[in-house]
Amino acid sequence: MIPWLPDDSDSAPFPPTRLALGPDSEAPGLLCAGGQLSVARLRMAYRLGIFPWYSQGQPVLWWSTDPRMVLQVAQFRLHRSLKKTLRRFLVTPGNEVRIDSAFADVIDHCSRTPREGQDGTWIVPEVKAAYVALHRAGSAHSFETWVDGELVGGLYGVNIGRMFYGESMFARRTDASKIALAALVAFCLAHEIAWIDCQMETEHLASLGAQPVPRAQFEAHLRRVVDLPAPKDWFYDPSSWARLGDRGPGQPSPSA
């Protein structure tokens, strides 16, 4: 039996993450169930490296996976093809990267994007509402790819201190989500956010430089960064691309 959180308290503590179900169980990383998706509860969870993930009809399920998939932004792999795509994107009229201009739309698109190996979505209506509330409280943000006024890709996640926790992404055009991810990496480099939590290991994330780290190492990093000042200005700064250094798209001329 896994522990249950009370539904009438935002301050009841989570169980120690070492009690999460192990790799040989049917649900590796499952820590506890129950409780509410309030802003206070979500902030408490993310500070500890715990995240909610469940399907329609299930109770709220809380997870602490081991290992944890992490993108250390200094290790981000901007492949040649994506670098070329970025250069073209940045000089084409009507193309934009935005931050937090359409958070609710981003999470809605993420909820409707089919995922290989998943039947339905974990971004159920109460999850959408909870993260929109977290966004309004200043702790959840979206990075968005726009073409001619149309939202064509993006991602959203949670920020606590100097940590960013990626939640989900979508693309309605080729590489649109990768452009948003590159913008997030550039933002993190500019604001001294060293790690982006990716939660689950996938080949796609690994191809971009993400690696699994032991839970103990992940939690030690959280303890160092979650109480540091969070970024205050969540807006797109074109100069942030320079933070990618030689890997970045540079400042191409219109003829590039």
Curated annotation (Swiss-Prot):
Main enzyme class: transferase
Highest taxon listed in the record's lineage: Bacteria
Enzyme Commission code(s) on record: 2.3.2.6
InterPro entries hit by this protein: Acyl_CoA_acyltransferase (IPR016181), Leu/Phe-tRNA_Trfase (IPR004616), Leu/Phe-tRNA_Trfase_C (IPR042203), Leu/Phe-tRNA_Trfase_N (IPR042221)
Gene Ontology biological process terms, A to Z: protein catabolic process
Function statement: Functions in the N-end rule pathway of protein degradation where it conjugates Leu, Phe and, less efficiently, Met from aminoacyl-tRNAs to the N-termini of proteins containing an N-terminal arginine or lysine.
Family: Belongs to the L/F-transferase family.
Protein's recorded name: Leucyl/phenylalanyl-tRNA--protein transferase
Organism annotation: Leptothrix cholodnii (strain ATCC 51168 / LMG 8142 / SP-6) (Leptothrix discophora (strain SP-6))
Lineage: Bacteria, Pseudomonadati, Pseudomonadota, Betaproteobacteria, Burkholderiales
Chain's gene name: aat
